[in-house]
Amino acid sequence: MMINMNIEEQVEKWLLDEDLLREMKYDENADFHFIVEFPKENIMDVVKPKDKDSIIIACATQVAPQHINLMQSSDMKTQKEFILDLNFGLNQFLVDFELQVNNNILQQFVVTEQIFEDGLTKDMLIRTLKRVFKAKLHCIWLIDKKFGSLPAPSNENDMFI
């Protein structure tokens, strides 16, 4: 647990120990806001909101235009089933999520999870980063399953902006 260190110092140390910390961002609504890379080439945020006894792990993903086009070219039944399947699937990860949907087409999604101070350990932080990432991966895989994928991109991250 955290002995003789404040939360910011402890979380920063854990992230540095695992080579995950990429930058510290100024955020007027937070006591600290770290940008982390977990896993490689995936950016996430670790934030402690002001006056809260918890930290938030968040991962926001913008759906690439070519995938939006694939969704738009499908029928409405498929579009609605996809959004429903996405909600059911994400709910099983026990994370919070927000889907930005316009006319049954997913535009972007944000997956978040909260860890309260009394449960904050290095193990819990890393496990939560993994769970948030796996929930994001679920969204990506479900898009591929429902709408088909494009020819293999040169870089896996080309799929989502």
Q: Where are the predicted features?
A:
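Short, internal acidic amphipathic alpha-helical interface segments
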Residues: 61-108
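Long, contiguous binding/interaction regions
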Residues: 134
